[in-house]
Amino acid sequence: MKKLVAWFNGLSKMWKVVVIIGAVFVVIIALTTGEDEGEQTKTKKDSNKVVKTASRPKLSTKDLALIKADLAEFEARELSSEKILKDTIKEESWSDLDFANDNINQMIGTMKRYQQEILSIDAIKRSSEASADTEAFKKIFKEWSEFKIERIQVTIDLLNGKKDSEAVFKKTYPNQIIFKKVRTNKLQTALNNLKVGYELLDSQK
């Protein structure tokens, strides 16, 4: 530092002015560059924020129509399954155990397919990034549909002499009537909030 001061003092008056002006220019350029980089960083962050907001998943009109159609098909299979099971228990001539097994297995498979089709909708898969209504629908629909499917599976298992699944089912759902009623009401509310335009069969009773 002393050498630099000594060198500067040894310069002529004109060269001292030149050195001072040069130093000022260097400082100005450094400050300007820093501001530009800061502005670029801010712009990049703002841009990322806009992209993130724009990519927020939302249920489309097509998605809502699919939910409505799949729910109708899901409940239709449930009704058919219940009728087959009741008639088999009553030992109706047209519905023996072999017939019940074949048809109930098909019904359960179809119900699971419709369940997964709804849960595979992009906005529902990414519900944590979507609206609170979408998140609520996903949670309650999964609980409601799993209960419906398991209840049919347990009944056909009992007809086949398999009692283990009933014990598990009763432990999972200690009060089936209340569980069904509460989940039905919550799911209907979720459907109404999303404006799906579908009324669950249990809500019509």
Swiss-Prot record:
Signal listed as a keyword: yes
Compartment(s) of residence: Secreted; Host nucleus
Q: What parts of the sequence cross the membrane?
A: none
Induction of this protein: by what? Induced in infected host cells. Expression is regulated by PrfA and sigma-B factor (SigB).
InterPro entries on file: LntA_helical (IPR054607), LntA_helix (IPR043113)
Signal sequence region: 1-36
Tagged with keyword Ribosomal protein: no
Keywords noted in UniProt: Host nucleus, Secreted, Signal, Virulence
Q: What does this protein do?
A: Relieves the repression of host cell immune response genes (interferon-stimulated genes) by blocking the recruitment of host BAHD1 to these genes. May modulate interferon-mediated immune response to control bacterial colonization of the host.
Please report the name of this protein according to its UniProt entry.
Answer: Listeria nuclear targeted protein A
Q: Which gene encodes it?
A: lntA
